[in-house]
From Swiss-Prot:
MF-aspect GO terms: rRNA binding; structural constituent of ribosome
Protein name per the record: Small ribosomal subunit protein uS14
Listed Gene3D superfamilies: 1.10.287.1480
Protein's gene: rpsN
Stated family: Belongs to the universal ribosomal protein uS14 family.
Alphabetical UniProt keywords: Ribonucleoprotein, Ribosomal protein, RNA-binding, rRNA-binding
Source organism of the structure: Vesicomyosocius okutanii subsp. Calyptogena okutanii (strain HA)
Lineage of origin: Bacteria, Pseudomonadati, Pseudomonadota, Gammaproteobacteria, Candidatus Pseudothioglobaceae
Length: 101
């Protein structure tokens, strides 16, 4: 089981990413635009850098919904590999069964 503080930190990051998502997209659009002057582009870059670090979606970490484990995570199920296996063996994941041929 992951530390509660780490899991809470990721939840906090998710909230911050949602809060600044529109602003980040707007600034990135200005930076990538060809029609914008160099000065405007430079100002947009400075504003983007002034945003909190945790506002960047790359700082988020996908975690298992049961254990909080950050590695071996399957997005489709929202579980880490070991918990996915346990849930599958118990028949808790619909449509998933152990392979046999």
């Amino acid at each position: 089981m992951a530390k509660k503080s780490m899991m809470n930190r990721d939840i906090k990051r998710t909230k911050i990413v949602k809060k600044y998502k529109a602003k980040r997209l707007e600034l990135k659009k200005i930076i990538k635009s060809i029609n914008v002057s160099d000065e405007e582009r430079f100002q947009a870059t400075i504003k983007l850098q002034a945003l909190p670090r945790n506002a960047s979606p790359t700082r988020q970490r996908s975690r298992c919904s049961l254990t909080g484990r950050p590695h071996g995570f399957y997005r489709k199920f929202g579980l880490a590999r070991n918990k996915l296996r346990e849930c599958t063996m118990n028949g808790e994941v619909p449509g998933l069964s152990k392979a046999s041929w």
